[in-house]
Amino acid sequence: MKITGRNIKRRLYGLRTLPSKLKRARYFRGHGVHSPFVYSIVREVFMRSELNTERRELYDALMKINVAKRRAIQLQNLMEHCKYATFKIDCEPQQIKDCDMVIASIDIPAEELATLADKAREEQTTLCIMSPSLDHQRDKACQAIVEAHPCTSVDNHGYLLLFNNYLPKQKFRL
């Protein structure tokens, strides 16, 4: 007689990934992040679900290009937290000058991301790449950019932040 229904293997299937999910949740809250700058970003930006200030320019621009509301709120809060005044979305590498933050949406092909990252590094501008693991080609391009990046990078699965300032080379995957 064959036993049907949910056996013990099927009941415990979800527990296999539990340690990695708990680890990611801890990093999301800031545990294990030993950089004061990144820790403050985790606490003041990633863990907020509402806008911190009345400024909404970046939020409105991101909502127009169909970025998720949560990601738009986080990036607007990041702009306020880092005291950035100007931003550009999907600009050419030559247009990065005089800009604090550049956002590369999913409309930018993976082949052009490295050029954009190099120009952002030259101009000391923070680069935000939306959906870094959208497909295999974009994921590989973003991994290569992070490996070559001389400063701090933060990947929170929704976007990849490449800071080009005084911070040491650190890679965070939250």
What are the language-model segments listed below?
Residues 1-123, 133-174:
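A short alpha-helical cap/connector motif
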